[in-house]
Amino acid sequence: MSLPASFDLTPEDAKLLLAANVHLGSKNVQVHNKPYVYKTRPDGVNIINIGKTWEKIVLAARIIAAVPNSSDVAVCSSRTFGQRAVLKFAAHTGATAIAGRFTPGNFTNYITRSFKEPRLVIVTDPRTDAQAIKESSYVNIPVIALTDMDSPSEYVDVAIPCNNKGKHSIGLIWWLLAREVLRLRGIIADRTTEWSVMPDLYFYRDPEEIEQNATEDVQGEEVEEVQAAEAETEWTGETEEVDWAESGATPAAEDAAASNW
C-alpha cells in the first residue's frame, strides 16, 4: 500500500518505533504475517518492517475516523501492559474502553448490563483478546488488532504488525494511532504541529512501583527536614544574656584591670 507523501513515516517517528522495540517480533511466524518480516536475526528473532507497521497505523486511523460516532469504537485490552494505553486512547478519541477481563456476552448477550453494540473493535493482542474477536465475528463487527509475527489472524480485518508484548511498544502504537485519528479529525491542525501529549502517558506503570517511589520520596523529605532542623539548632543556638549591672557581678576582664591599678 503506497501512501501520499504527506502520510510518509517521518524520521522522528521511525526513531520512536525503533526505541520502543516495535520492530522486534517473535521467533515463530504465522503464514499470513510473512510479508511483514524484514529479516531474521541469527538468534531467530524476526525483524518487523516498521514501514509496513506505519502504513497499517494510517489505514486503521482512517477507518476509525470514518466512524461517525466515536463512542461506537470499542478498544479492548486483556493484557496488563495495554490497559493504561486503551484508557488513554479512549479519553483522547472518545472511544469506549474495555480494560481488563472481557466479559463473555458483551457483544452478543443483550441481557447483560455491560452489553455493547460497537461498529468497530480494536484489540491489543489476538490471543489474550480472543473472546472479543470471536464475539465480533458473530455479529459482523470489523476488527483491528495489534499482531506479532506469531499471532493468529482469524477474524482480524486489519492487522498492525508490531511487538505486542512490550509495554513501551504497545503504548507507542496506541499513541501513534490516537495522534493519527486526531489529525484526520482536524483536532490537531496539521501534520507539522506536534501533539502536546507525550508517548510516556500511554506506557504501563506498575502501581506498586509508583507507591514505593512515593513512600521513598516522603521518607527522604522527612530525613532532610530532620537534618535541617538539627543543623539549624547547632549553628544558631541561642546563648543566655547576662545583665552585669543588675546582677552586681563584674566581668573577669574588668576585675583583672582593676587589680592592676
From Swiss-Prot:
Give all cystine bridges in this chain: none
Q: What's in the keyword line of the UniProt record?
A: Acetylation, Cytoplasm, Ribonucleoprotein, Ribosomal protein
Q: Which InterPro entries match?
A: Ribosomal_uS2 (IPR001865), Ribosomal_uS2_CS (IPR018130), Ribosomal_uS2_euk (IPR027498), Ribosomal_uS2_euk/arc (IPR005707), Ribosomal_uS2_flav_dom_sf (IPR023591)
List where Acidic residues composition bias occurs.
230-244
Q: Which domain of life is it from?
A: Eukaryota
Q: Report the subcellular localization.
A: Cytoplasm
Q: Pfam families attached here?
A: Ribosomal_S2
N-acetylserine modified-residue sites: S2
A single Gene Ontology CC annotation of this entry is: cytosolic small ribosomal subunit
Alphabetical GO biological process terms: ribosomal small subunit assembly; translation
Quaternary assembly? Component of the small ribosomal subunit. Mature ribosomes consist of a small (40S) and a large (60S) subunit. The 40S subunit contains about 33 different proteins and 1 molecule of RNA (18S). The 60S subunit contains about 49 different proteins and 3 molecules of RNA (25S, 5.8S and 5S). Interacts with RPS21.
Q: Which NCBIfam families match?
A: uS2_euk_arch (TIGR01012)
Q: Which HAMAP family match?
A: Ribosomal_S2_euk
Put simply, this protein is called Small ribosomal subunit protein uS2
- Organism source for this protein? Lodderomyces elongisporus (strain ATCC 11503 / CBS 2605 / JCM 1781 / NBRC 1676 / NRRL YB-4239)
- Taxonomic lineage per UniProt? Eukaryota, Fungi, Dikarya, Ascomycota, Saccharomycotina
